[in-house]
């Protein structure tokens, strides 16, 4: 169980997150986090992993979540990465297993087998030795997901994983996330495309600095909850399938 009580976050004298209270069981679920630009979606994920110093209580398995980070894997936005760093696809993905096997230890046989399966499943075999600076947006996102899946985490936090990627990459990633869900993992995804929300998510957290709605995806897509969150009529936007936020 992730148990958040009265979370508040101030950044640069701005009240970014206000009185966030949530209880989320670890029971095999994909949850979308949606809201307008500046709503605090990315800040919520960063607060959970301790990158931002939010107040309030944040617990995982009845202990401070910041002391339980071995159970959590975080995938940042691609824009936050240093793509000029000289490292190839293989090394990026294998770095994900150190959380399990420990740093400065040789990659064991089981991890190598898992690595090669991820290469196949995410269509990365031909890119194994390419530098990350040579990859397209979709290829890079598949590499980041493969790296995350090398760990044996319980909770996966993904910040805008589908921005700027091709349809095939998006589908391959969703297949792997569904597999994680079927294993009982919890996946939280910051997302912006309303047209795919019901298809991708079991539940949706609508956020605009505070919780506007949290519940089944089909209910979250009702106009009264969307309008309350985005503060304008989003019906036409939903019909068009437009991207409406980027935070």
PLM-predicted stretches and their roles:
Residues 131-135, 139:
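Conserved ABC ATPase signature
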Residues 191-192:
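H-loop/switch region of ABC-family ATPase nucleotide-binding domains
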Residues 204-217:
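H-loop (His-switch) and adjacent beta-strand-loop-beta switch element
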